[in-house]
Amino acid sequence: MQGIAVSGLAPSESSRYTFLMKPLPHDGPALLGPDDPPTFEVINREGGAHILLVCDHASREVPKSLNHLGLGAEAFERHIAYDIGAAAVTRGLVERLDAQAVLAGYSRLVIDVNRPPGHPESIVPENDSIPVPGNQNLTDEARRQRVRELFEPYHDSVNRALARLWNRGPAPAIFSVHSFSPYFGDKSRPWDIGVLWNRDPRIAIPLMEHL
């Protein structure tokens, strides 16, 4: 059984449809090919709620050029590849709240869009004691390519969604939807749901009081 974690942030066109987009081409060989899925998905762009849902670890896709990062199919059934169930929860919240959502299109094993470029956990050589061959001994250019073709388009889309909401009214609420495994190493995670925040509790505290 997976748990669901929601992070709430309060930052200082009217039909329901989905946008699927890929990054613009650039000089040099591309990471993504014509048969690869989009880098992100925008759902319900014109949603009426003043809420943005983001799902950083929605997908377990890997660009075909990376040959599954040298991993077997079983690795992509596990939580190391994506947040199991988080995309479905995000889509359900879109329907219930009439909110906009942006979902990342590629596995956290390729690049973790929830970490800044250069962070030790951005592109990991191993995850949960499982080596990731396709992430080992990468050149600086190979790392930049993943940032350029996967990380930046996703975050640009999130920024555009925020700009649309800012232009419509007061500061929007942002919720980042994740899931977590019952165990992390040998430590139990017995909770069904978690609410996380950093310095601003204005959304998190009332949300927990109503759960």
Located regions from the model:
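N-terminal catalytic or cofactor-binding beta/alpha core of small enzyme domains
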Residues: 17-174, 179-211
